[in-house]
């Protein structure tokens, strides 16, 4: 009794749920489960060492049958968090083959409506696809297996991702890459840790990288997330080959935020008003914003 027994399929150890990452045959539990998730697309990915965090405050615990640990998948993690009263939002499922407009692309078919959309340990390691128009109230990247969550066009020039007032929030060490047309809606905050980035980049349309159309009516406040310690790295926003289209927007860059325009050298660019606060940086890289659109309020604007 009390002896740790290894599950031959997942590599999990019974009794190994104390936040430590154990090692099985030279691989950590996390590596074993990541390999398993990648080899079997139908499975979600939820490392056992993350379950105590997901189940904090509830009485579900983890059940055993003799010396074998019951298999715990992404749906268990989702349900545990839901039963614990946590705001799980709409959690991205492991069905990366389905576009975000499909109910099965979300845990328990909980489609985004007024829910913030979450990428976490239950989510796929593969890019998420946008087919047609997809409306998300907001995006929260918590602790997926990958450092960079990619949301990209399925390949049509009409694909479009709408980001609403829920804005964007990234966990420390995580990045978000949007490779599809983007429409911004409402007053929203982008909360980005130092060293992390939100990138809007060319989308693959018929195997060609096409400029991204940026549209909508919004007021975007970009701030560096608190709690990053004494990090000297900026929170970054990168707009690469972006084509504003009927865009009515204002951007407020707070301290320790850096916005960079790429691939638009010599081109006139109308992103709306961009307020560069003290401690913020705007890199134009040769692009030519509309006269009067950049308002420097104590920050740095590099031509």
Predicted feature residues:
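Leucine-rich solenoid repeat scaffolds
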Residues: 290-303
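Right-handed beta-helix
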Residues: 198, 258-263
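Glycine- and acidic-residue-biased ligand/ion/polar-headgroup-sensing regions
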Residues: 235, 249, 253-257, 272, ...
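Residue-level detector of buried hydrophobic side-chain packing
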Residues: 1-2, 33, 76, 106, ...
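Cell-envelope and extracellular/periplasmic
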Residues: 1-88
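Solvent-exposed adhesion/ligand-recognition segments of exported proteins
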Residues: 89-207, 221-224, 238-245, 249-250, ...
